[in-house]
Amino acid sequence: MSGLYFEQFFVGQSFNHPWSRTVTEMDNVMYCALTMNVAPIHLDEHYMAGTPFGQRIVAGLYTVGLMIGQSINDTTLGTTVANLAMSDMQFPNPVFHGDTIRTRTKVVSVRESKSRPDAGLVEFEHTGINQHDVVVATCRRTALMQRQPKPA
């Protein structure tokens, strides 16, 4: 377990996660198949050739999932009780096959849980950045995090 406990998070804390991933055509096609997303914007090369993008765009929720996956090892792995909310998803620039995505995370709020004395709420802002240092996605995630165990 390498995640942090509730007490170890503070507002303004930031993480530049060391992992990156080059998104492949197979990633996008499999994600679309698994989620039954048949939008031509993600799957139809000929259709997209006639658009301003000129090529298929990777599904935005795949990118969000990738960002959260890249963030958990040094933030919430093994210490998350539950993810409670995802909000404010934005996709200011497209992700294309072959783009390499890395993630930066900032803690935007930390608060006590009113119903769970053994846990607290942490809100994260995740930012996905491509190989050209261009922001491709942002989202907020609220997680219910374990408190540190009391010494025996």
Language-model segments: residues:
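Hot-dog-fold acyl-thioester-processing enzymes
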Residues: 1-85, 150-152
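HotDog/MaoC-like acyl-thioester-processing domains
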Residues: 1-11, 91, 95-100, 104-152
